[in-house]
C-alpha cells in the first residue's frame, strides 16, 4: 500500500473504533498516521493520558480486520500498551465495509 492509502485506511478504521467505543479514556496512536481517544472511563484533559496504546499501521490494520488477535499482537511486542484500560480486545475486529 502507498502512504496515502495507508493514511486513509488507518483514519477510517480508527473512526470505526471511536464509533464502537465512544469516550476519551484510552489514547490509540498509530504513528505517523493518526491518534484518537476512545473508550469509556475517566478522561484526561492535559499531558499524557493514563491509558495509551501505540502500534504500527500494519499491526493496527491487521487487528481491525481480524487478521491477528489482540493477545497475539501484544505478546509479539507489536503493541505498546500502558494503563489499566489499555486493551482494545473487546472492540476488535471492526466491521469493515469493502
Predicted regions and their residues:
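Feature captures hydrophobic
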Residues: 1-98
Amino acid at each position: 500500500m502507498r502512504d496515502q492509502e495507508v493514511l486513509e485506511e488507518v483514519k477510517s478504521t480508527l473512526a470505526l473504533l471511536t464509533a464502537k467505543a465512544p469516550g476519551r479514556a484510552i489514547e490509540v496512536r498509530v504513528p505517523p498516521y493518526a491518534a484518537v481517544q476512545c473508550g469509556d472511563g475517566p478522561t484526561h484533559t492535559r499531558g499524557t493520558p493514563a491509558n495509551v496504546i501505540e502500534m504500527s499501521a500494519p499491526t493496527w490494520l491487521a487487528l481491525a480486520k481480524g487478521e491477528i488477535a489482540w493477545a497475539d499482537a501484544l505478546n509479539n511486542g507489536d503493541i505498546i500498551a500502558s494503563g489499566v484500560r489499555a486493551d482494545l480486545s473487546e472492540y476488535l475486529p471492526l466491521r469493515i465495509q469493502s
